[in-house]
């Protein structure tokens, strides 16, 4: 019997909050980002999630910083690992609307492991907000990683808001847009549960 599956998620919160939990993100750049843009997006996304107690380990699987063979890109995926695609095209909407979405994640209430971010959509939004493209790209990646940990829902404020506004863009410029405290606790507990299960 696997006891970790019978433990309620909230029982892991106390122990999980004592130390940072690790999330491995396999980055697949199909959009041809420069090394500088890639470095900025990984730094920004890492900082956005670090505030919640999540340490991101990047596996550069495809793109300017990829150095083959990347072991994390080749081995079987673990529960604490996600795939993040950076695409050169727009992303199709699941409900048929014409809104250009920054990203998309295949997620259920239990989370997910596959996400994509659209470079054209991010460029357009960054221009509208008057902020750096690679800064917004980092936040878009962090947002989609959040869906992988939290599920498909959105919040009324912060990193997981459905549609960011200029106030959010100002917070991004200060590197101060984060998960809410409740979201952070849930995300860290999910990672702790995944890592505990992987050891058994």
Show which residues each predicted segment covers.
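Bacterial N-terminal signal peptides that target proteins for export
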Residues: 1-8
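A very general structural signal that marks isolated residues within well-ordered alpha-helical segments
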Residues: 8, 51, 151-152
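Metalloprotease/metallohydrolase-associated module, dominated by Zn2+-dependent proteases
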Residues: 21-46, 105-131, 135-136, 148, ...
């Amino acid at each position: 019997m696997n006891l970790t599956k019978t433990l309620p998620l909230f029982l892991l919160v106390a122990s999980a909050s004592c130390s940072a939990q690790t999330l491995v993100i396999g980055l697949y750049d199909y959009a041809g980002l420069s090394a500088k843009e890639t470095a900025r997006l990984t730094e920004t996304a890492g900082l956005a999630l670090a505030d919640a107690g999540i340490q991101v380990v990047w596996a550069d699987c495809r793109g300017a910083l990829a150095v083959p063979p990347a072991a994390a890109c080749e081995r079987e995926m673990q529960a604490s690992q996600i795939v993040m695609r950076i695409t050169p095209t727009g992303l199709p909407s699941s409900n048929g609307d014409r809104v250009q979405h920054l990203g998309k994640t295949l997620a259920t209430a239990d989370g997910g492991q596959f996400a994509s971010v659209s470079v054209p959509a991010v460029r357009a939004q960054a221009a509208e907000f008057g902020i750096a493209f690679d800064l917004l790209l980092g936040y878009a990646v962090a947002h989609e990683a959040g869906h992988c940990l939290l599920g498909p829902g959105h919040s009324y404020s912060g990193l997981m808001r459905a549609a960011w506004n200029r106030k959010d863009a100002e917070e991004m410029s200060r590197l101060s847009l984060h998960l809410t405290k409740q979201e952070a606790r849930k995300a860290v507990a999910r990672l702790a549960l995944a890592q505990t299960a992987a050891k058994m």
